[in-house]
A protein has these predicted regions:
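Single conserved hydrophobic/aromatic residue that forms the stacking wall/gate
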Residues: 1-16
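Small-residue (primarily alanine) positions within well-ordered alpha-helices
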Residues: 9, 44, 48-51, 61, ...
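Zinc-dependent deaminase
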Residues: 20-54, 102, 115-184
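A short, polar/acidic, helix/strand-boundary loop motif
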Residues: 34, 77-78
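Short, basic and Ser/Thr-rich N-terminal targeting/leader segments
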Residues: 55-59, 105
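Short beta-strand scaffold segments in enzyme catalytic cores
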Residues: 59-67
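Short beta->alpha transition motifs characteristic of CBS
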Residues: 70-77
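Helix-adjacent hinge/juxtasegments
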Residues: 81-85, 89-122
Length: 184
């Protein structure tokens, strides 16, 4: 009888080992080199430039799966007169359509500024496993600065977070925008 339990437990452990290898393989597919990460963040910065050209708060975002951009977004609240039109929301929406799924598993979201509470919630709901952002958002950040929604253990989906990628460039576009806005 003990042997059967051990054998059954052994089978479970073997299956878990296989699942762990599969999970590890998937995670490795999302581990980009620093050059690749910088390339994707530069694409997010291009999106921020689009926002800036439209006199929007210059935040940009790209969502990447298997090394391909599947969603892009930039702030468009003023243009569309919709409060929820943040860069992350637009990128998630585009990726949902591209993938024909609300689940954006095996993706990495690159955004120039730390996501706010709303966007962090959307990231969790979309099951995005990894977020890489440029500069912290001390006033609205929900990825570790003001709040920590992305990694909160009380929630059923936690996100791996990296910060500080091209931080100076990401912060500079925001600082210049607000400096110029105060002059008006």
């Amino acid at each position: 009888s003990t042997h059967c339990i051990s054998s059954a437990a052994s089978d479970v452990y073997k299956r878990q080992g296989i699942m762990n290898k599969e999970t590890k393989r998937k995670r490795e597919e999302m581990d980009y080199t620093i050059e690749e990460k910088e390339m994707f963040m530069r694409e997010a910065l291009k999106e921020a430039e689009f926002a800036l050209a439209n006199d929007e708060i210059p935040i940009g975002c790209v969502l990447v799966k298997n090394g391909q951009i599947i969603g892009r977004g930039h702030n468009a609240r003023e243009e569309l007169q919709r409060a929820v039109m943040h860069a992350e929301i637009m990128a998630i929406e585009e990726a949902n359509q591209q993938e024909n799924s609300w689940r954006l598993l095996d993706t990495t979201l690159f955004v120039t500024i730390e996501p706010c509470v709303m966007c962090s919630g959307a990231i969790g709901l979309a099951r995005i496993p990894k977020v890489i952002y440029g500069a912290k958002n001390q006033k609205f950040g929900a990825g570790g600065s003001l709040y920590d929604i992305l990694t909160d253990e009380r929630l059923n989906h936690r996100v791996e977070v990296e910060s500080g990628l091209l931080e100076e460039e990401c912060a500079a576009i925001m600082q210049n925008f607000f400096r110029n806005r105060r002059k008006k």
